[in-house]
Amino acid sequence: MGDFILRGWNWCRRFRHRCGYGVHSPSDFFFITFVIYERLPFYAYAPLHHLRRVVAFLPHYREKVDKFLFRLINHLRPSVVWEVGTGSGISTRYMAEANTGMQVYTFSEQSEDAVKRILSGKSSIDYLTGNCEADMDRLLKKGVKPEVVHIAHTPAYKEMFERLIPLADKHTCFIIGNPYATPEKKRWWKEVIADPRTGITFDLYDVGLVFFDKERVKEHRIVNFL
């Protein structure tokens, strides 16, 4: 009940930030209107919906957010995604289904049998457990560099951001999971928005998006996605 009331309060606060109102950049308006707010029933939504209950006891986003991650990957078309903090693995599946030509490397401190079950059906997903920094170093030595980074269900979000931001270029997108989860993370998210190393940022409440195209004027977009 507390979360429901909080979301209602934040929805009211973000009311004027809905549907791209006040956004003058054509590319940002397109992104908000046709990626964030797209309502078409994509082909993968139905089978993925039935997988959710298998891993519902593990950390996960709302289904609405996972559908957005599907659309985001479908829009960006990266060849490599790195995800730190697998959680339930359901977001991993949504992203993998959006672009069958890419490889997803998802890093988790420990292995979960239920997560293995829902990820094993996709050869494009590597579920890496244990020392994630060692796995990252190994991938980088092989020339495997992420175009999308999902900092998801991990308490080491600050460390992972600093570890991975040197890999970012104008084509990179960072997805920050649950930026309002705690007061400390909320303060850190504000620092990320103001960081001179980052470019355009989007705040959807459940997730934040960070882009790094320094040719564009740095702006922050709040989107009512509650």
Regions inferred by a protein language model and the residue ranges of each:
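A short alpha-helical cap/connector motif
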Residues: M1-H150, T154-K170, Y180-L226
